[in-house]
Amino acid sequence: MNASELLHRHLDQCPLVAIIRGVTPDEAEAIGDAIYESGIRIIEVPLNSPDPLKSIERLAAKFGERMLVGGGTVLDAEQVRAVKESGGRLIVSPNTNVEVIEETVDAGLVASPGYFTPSDAFDALEAGATALKLFPAEAASPAVLKAQRAVLPKDVPILIVGGVKPDSLRPWIDAGANGFGLGGGLYQPGQSPAETLEKARAYVAGLKA
């Protein structure tokens, strides 16, 4: 299964990515259980979390093929390699860094770099990006996405990240979004698994609104 097939397999089950910034390794598995129970099948552990590679390792070992687990805020090629060694299969960046994308592609992992302009997007795609992350979405709009969708390849998934709320998903979907990255609205450091499950279910319900 190549990177694109891997991503689509999990996005097709639920087009949401749980970004659990600030989670600790001791919390990761219980938080992962809550996210899995909600129906979400993709987890991103930002690398500016406490001991993130250990959290990725534990989540990847626990869920195996049932979830797509990886690292976020990946800023250089060395971090790509570290995530892979920890069992992660997804690399998410806040920016369009060709070196990071190419290293991710060479490693056979899913590459989801951040972009904001069409120039960013085409640079990322030329480097081999699997998907594109519109970030920060708070500074864009569904109208902006719709205009970008008119020129970007139709088969490239675009994920919306930044300020996404359960009641704001539908306009983005109608504009051409394929999924969403859920950050602070889903998880805050120290949050309980029960609260995480409640918030995750609200986002899953928002997809059907």
Give the predicted meaning of each segment.
Residues 90, 94-100, 133-142, 175-199:
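Glycine-rich phosphate-binding active-site loops on the catalytic face of alpha/beta enzymes
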Residues 76-86, 119-127, 164-180:
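Catalytic cores of alpha/beta
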Residues 36-41, 63-66, 85-91, 106-112, ...:
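Glycine-enriched alpha-helix->loop->beta-strand junction motifs that scaffold or abut catalytic
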Residues 47-48, 74, 96-98, 116-117, ...:
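Short, ordered loop/turn segments at secondary-structure junctions
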Residues 145-152:
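A charged, well-structured terminal subsegment
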Residues 1-86, 96, 106, 166-167, ...:
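Conserved N-terminal beta1-alpha1 strand-loop-helix module at the mouth
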Residues 16-20, 43-45, 69-72, 91-92, ...:
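Hydrophobic faces of well-ordered beta-strands that scaffold small-molecule active sites
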Residues 90, 94-140:
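Histidine/lysine/aspartate-rich catalytic loop segments that bind and position anionic ligands
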